[in-house]
UniProtKB/Swiss-Prot annotation:
It comes from Eisenia fetida. It catalyses: L-lombricine + ATP = N-phospho-L-lombricine + ADP + H(+). This is Lombricine kinase. Belongs to the ATP:guanido phosphotransferase family. Signal peptide: none annotated.
Length: 371
């Protein structure tokens, strides 16, 4: 069988206008340099860029098949990380974790405006391939490691694990009603990267009795850790999130396991967008007046926040309730990102109240938006 060259195998990005980040950064020369390289687990550059080939409109189009992908293919990953995270060069380093909820300033909002709060992060177990390349045996072992650790949680964090394969119709119905159940993903990243192989083998959901602390196992990331509750107490959600995450890490270490961590990139996740903290702190925020302001989108961006619809990404806002979160994941600690959300949401509510009173907000907007 003939051996084809890298240039013969180079993806066709030109015909779609290089809409994804990979298409903008991966040249034929770079591809040729990376073409023959393999990680210790056998992951190739083609495995990592497959989402960009199958769906050229995707923003990033790049996944890591294992933690080592970030180093072996760093020429491409570093370029994409630098663009995605607004400047993060080869010598930059992500700060150490900071889960100190007591150091937060504010964070308790009027439930008239903040309907609920949610904080999540992604984690990967050190020593295993990531979802795009993980084997069935590895995935099952990851499930075992995490479930064993969760069994050690006590008090308000104690809960029950529901494997997708063994779920009863009643359990499934309840989890759907709670909006907890993740179905087989159909998104381009998961499907094109191969992360949905063998579904639903070794996938499951765990939650505590109060349904305020939730774990997803083997979805886009090996572990998704989520804290949430109704109302406006963001600080309480971060406290529970931090306490649960710290306890899980401690229980894992007792059995000789830990989460994958890079001194430069922070916690390792499947998608480069989630490197660093992997943290997304969000609130459901009702803004009847501000959402009608002509600079609403610009105001959100000015506070380094991101806006989604009520149901999350690619949904519309219902009754002017928006999902507002931190935009970045890298270059700041967990506490700093939650504080950024708190500060920004506080300003948005301040503007909403002024508009409710029939006043202008033009004079109190960030300097970059005045005029």
């Amino acid at each position: 069988m003939p051996k084809f060259t890298a240039r013969q195998n180079f993806p066709d990005y030109k015909s779609n206008g290089h809409k994804c980040m990979v298409g903008r950064h991966l040249t034929e020369d770079m591809y040729e340099r990376l073409y023959e390289l393999r990680t210790p687990n056998g992951v190739s550059i083609d495995k990592c860029i497959q989402p960009s080939v199958d769906n050229t409109g995707r923003i990033i189009g790049l996944v890591a098949g294992d933690p080592e992908s970030y180093e072996v293919f760093k020429e491409l990953f570093d370029a994409v990380i630098n663009e995605k995270h607004g400047g993060f060069g080869p010598t930059d380093k992500h700060p150490p974790p900071d889960l100190n909820a007591n150091a937060l300033v504010g964070g308790q909002f009027d439930p008239k405006y903040v309907k609920s709060a949610r904080i999540r992060t992604g984690r990967s177990v050190k020593g295993f391939c990531l979802p795009p390349s993980i084997s069935r045996a590895e995935r099952r072992e990851v499930e075992r490691i995490i479930v064993d650790a969760l069994a050690g949680l006590e008090g308000d964090l104690a809960g029950v694990y529901y494997p997708l394969k063994k779920m009863t119709p009643e359990q499934e119905k309840q989890l759907i009603a709670d909006h907890f159940l993740f179905q087989k993903p159909t998104g381009h990243l998961m499907v094109n990267s191969g992360a949905v192989r063998d579904w639903p083998d070794a996938r499951g959901i765990w939650h505590n009795k109060d349904k305020t602390f939730l774990i997803w196992i083997n979805e886009e990331d090996q572990v998704r850790i989520i804290a949430m509750q109704h109302g406006g107490d963001v600080k309480a959600v971060f406290e529970r999130f931090s306490r649960g995450l710290t306890q899980i890490e401690g229980l894992m270490k007792k059995h000789g396991h830990e989460f994958a961590w890079s001194e430069r990139l922070g916690y390792i996740c499947t998608c480069p967008s989630n490197l660093g903290t992997g943290l997304r702190a969000s609130v459901h925020l009702q803004l009847h007046k501000l959402s009608k302001h002509p600079k609403f989108e610009e105001i959100i961006l000015a506070f380094h926040l991101q806006k989604r619809g009520t149901g999350g990404e690619h949904t519309e806002a219902v009754d002017d309730v928006y999902d507002i979160s931190n935009r970045a994941r890298l270059k700041k600690s967990e506490r700093e990102f939650v504080q950024l959300l708190i500060d920004g949401v506080g300003k948005l509510i301040e503007y909403e109240k002024l508009l409710e009173a029939g006043k202008s907000i033009d004079d109190v907007l960030p300097a970059s938006l005045k005029g």
